[in-house]
């Protein structure tokens, strides 16, 4: 069997407004989370019409308890009330990343190489937005995923959402 074909997607970043909002929220909230002794695994801001959801994923060695989420929620709420970065109504959720943990950064993708992932792109590539396969790793600013016998290089900026698919073996 010959070498697997490699596909590369280059995408201009859409959703700049959401991206800058996420960057603003990350800059505001990551120090709060880390100051409490947790890792800020990632932040999601999902606008759903008049109402939005702000999710903060936290992690630490040994796992996360409900009390950990409460502590981060209290501190994050206080900062959000003072800084007021979100003008519309929203719900704040604080959670552990869980078994199907979302992946946000190149470092997270690299550390989970060898695991099965589900990736959704912002815009279609090769007629598809959804990829499910083996996470091969990272090359520069690209996430490498193998779907069947095809390898795809997906720029981190083109990824809308990515999650680990838990293995129950």
Curated annotation (Swiss-Prot):
Its main location: cytoplasm. The keyword Cytoplasm applies. One of its GO terms (biological process) is ribosomal small subunit assembly. InterPro entries: Ribosome_maturation_RimP, RimP_C, RimP_C_sf, RimP_N, RimP_N_sf. Keywords: Cytoplasm, Ribosome biogenesis. The keyword Cell membrane does not apply. It is found in: Cytoplasm. GO terms for cellular component: cytosol. PANTHER family: RIBOSOME MATURATION FACTOR RIMP. Belongs to the RimP family. Required for maturation of 30S ribosomal subunits. This is Ribosome maturation factor RimP. It comes from Pseudomonas putida (strain W619). The lineage of its organism: Bacteria, Pseudomonadati, Pseudomonadota, Gammaproteobacteria, Pseudomonadales.
């Amino acid at each position: 069997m010959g070498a697997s074909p490699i596909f590369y997607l280059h995408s201009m970043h859409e959703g700049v407004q959401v991206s800058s909002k996420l960057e603003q929220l990350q800059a505001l909230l990551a120090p709060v989370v880390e100051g409490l002794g947790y890792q800020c695994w990632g932040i999601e801001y999902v606008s759903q019409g008049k109402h939005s959801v702000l999710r903060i994923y936290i992690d630490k060695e040994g796992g996360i308890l409900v009390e950990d989420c409460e502590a981060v929620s209290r501190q994050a709420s206080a900062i959000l009330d003072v800084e007021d970065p979100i003008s519309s109504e929203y719900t704040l959720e604080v959670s552990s990343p869980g078994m199907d943990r979302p992946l946000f950064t190149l470092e997270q993708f690299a550390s989970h190489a060898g695991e099965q992932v589900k990736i959704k792109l912002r815009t279609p590539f090769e007629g598809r937005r959804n990829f499910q396969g083996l996470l091969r790793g990272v090359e520069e600013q690209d996430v490498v995923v193998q779907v069947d016998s095809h390898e795809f290089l997906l720029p981190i900026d083109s990824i809308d959402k990515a999650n680990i698919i838990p293995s129950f073996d």
